[in-house]
Design a protein with these regions (language model features):
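Short coil turns that delineate tetratricopeptide repeat
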Residues: 44, 78, 112-115, 149, ...
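Alpha-helical segment of the N-proximal tetratricopeptide repeat
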Residues: 46-72, 76, 253
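Start-of-helix register in tetratricopeptide repeats
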Residues: 48, 82, 116-119, 159, ...
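Residue-level recognition of tetratricopeptide repeat
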Residues: 55, 89, 126, 166, ...
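Register position in tetratricopeptide repeats
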Residues: 59-60, 93-94, 130, 163, ...
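Canonical positions in the second alpha-helix
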Residues: 72-73, 106-110, 144, 184, ...
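Canonical tetratricopeptide repeat
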Residues: 86, 119-123, 156, 163, ...
Length: 327
């Protein structure tokens, strides 16, 4: 029988594995669990064996084996939140979202704290993201947003709103994306005694989002205005870790302007381990008629094992496009 500390570490380890490509998504989760871990000294050193084994199997591309492992775990421990989230995540990666959501629903039922329930609800939201279903993603992200609102945790509310917006923009629902990005910006700035660097972070993200939305709407002048504003905020030097998101932004805007050569130059400067970037590079090469390079990048994106907006966009699209490319 696992201890509460082991169960908590299992959940954290799972979220690290499934959200590794998009680090700020994991930070939201780990922050909410920190007080609980503080109540179980030494538990940080423990990690259930099924989580370690499952992570390794997924890295090796053995999703069926990982799923079987998580199901065996649930036979022995039917209330394991980590195992429910893990099993559902694997099913989403396999394109079996309807099955996966049964595990997330059960995770919501067995969650023993609001924070744990938020984790399961967030996983459910991401399940719908794999199907580009903005409406259902928002339905569950709203519940997570409200939980953090009850705690007056404005930063995490902002993170959740931005996550919902990211799903909506790539689902093609630009009005919803704008609403949630604006909500994330405005809510994040409510943080008491907010530091200038944090303010700049929210301004950078908001300009970044507005540029992408304008590009998707075909308004290049507006997109370029917001790119300039984002560069301005970044130029303050308060958030150097955001550097990788500028070439992503410029490549994204160029892609939707139809300037695929410029898009490629910028996207190749962005985070090459991000499945979203890998997929966009594949799309760009495909537009340029370079099928072999497109195949290479789609292949990379298709093997992502994260459970976040980046993978939710990349994995289904990359796999679909791989089947359409001439052999």
């Amino acid at each position: 029988m696992s201890t509460p500390g082991q169960r908590l570490c299992g959940i954290i380890a799972l979220m690290k594995a499934t959200m590794a490509i998009f680090p700020r998504a994991f930070l939201v989760v780990s922050a909410s669990l920190a007080p609980l871990l503080a109540q179980t000294p030494g538990s940080q050193q423990q990690q259930p064996e099924f989580i370690r084994q499952g992570q390794q199997l997924m890295r090796e591309g053995k999703l069926d084996d990982a799923l079987a492992l998580y199901r065996r775990t649930l036979e022995a421990s039917p209330n394991s939140l980590a195992a429910h989230i893990a099993a559902g995540s694997v099913l989403d990666l396999q394109g079996r979202g309807e099955e996966g959501r049964k595990y997330f629903a059960r995770g919501i039922e067995v969650a023993d704290t609001p924070e744990h329930k938020a984790m399961a609800q967030r996983a459910m939201a991401m399940s719908y993201a794999f199907e580009r279903n903005c409406k259902k993603t928002v339905e569950y992200e709203q519940q997570v947003f409200d939980i953090y609102g009850s705690e007056k945790n404005f930063f995490q509310q902002g993170e959740i709103a931005d996550e919902a917006a990211r799903v909506c923009i790539e689902s093609g629902d630009l009005d919803s994306a704008y609403h949630w990005y604006q909500l994330g910006h405005d809510t994040g700035l409510k943080e008491p005694a907010i530091k200038p660097a944090r303010q700049d972070l929210w301004e950078f993200r908001w300009e970044h989002a507005q540029a992408r939305i304008a590009a998707r709407r075909g308004n290049q002048a507006e997109a370029q205005k917001h790119i300039a504003a984002a560069k301005n905020v970044f130029g303050k030097g308060t958030n150097p870790e955001q550097a990788q998101f500028l070439p992503y932004l410029q490549g994204y805007v160029a892609f939707y302007a139809g300037d695929y050569q410029a898009a490629l130059v910028e996207l190749l400067k962005a985070n090459q381990n991000d499945p979203f970037i890998q997929c966009m590079i594949g799309q760009t090469y495909q537009k340029l008629g370079e099928k072999d390079k497109a195949f290479e990048y789609y292949s990379k994106a298709s093997t992502a094992i994260a459970h976040n907006p980046a993978a939710a966009y990349a994995v289904p699209l990359a796999r679909k496009n791989l089947t359409l490319l001439p052999s």
